[in-house]
Amino acid sequence: MVNLIRERLKAWEHSEYPGATRTTTELLAYWQDEGREKRLFYAQLEAAKTIIFLTEARQDLLQGIAVPRDDPSADRKESGYSGFLRYACKMATGAGKTTVMGMLTAWSILNKVASRGDKRFSDVVVAVCPNVTIRDRLTELQPERGEASIYRTRDLVPERLMPQLAQGRVLVTN
């Protein structure tokens, strides 16, 4: 399935992202701008684009790609719990996982703010950490940190979109 996703992702890119929202195409262009002072790593761009592709690509490009839902047990379903999609990006130490988290957080929040009724996006993001040290480090994902947030320190969001990003919430917990 991984090779099929890579192949379709390339086709999606070459076709200028059919199915993507205006917000998404703006962010993708911003992240890939050759004139960026703070260039993003190839692995960071590919990880973010893959998740975005799986969420927004036109249906014909997703044909044959079925990511299974993470469904709860039968007794949990009876209690009202529902399944969700869980995506994973395998990245090496030092490859910029926090930056990818910031890219995807900004993408989701900004799309939700632009289109409140679109259920593909959320303006609330929860980051669950394995320990206090990582939890403290990931507070840079919180938009209310403004210029100290990852969105400005790593130039993930154009300054003019920061007020919209501030309408979202990022909860970091362990």
State each model region's role.
Residues 1-174:
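RecA-like P-loop NTPase motor core of helicase/translocase proteins
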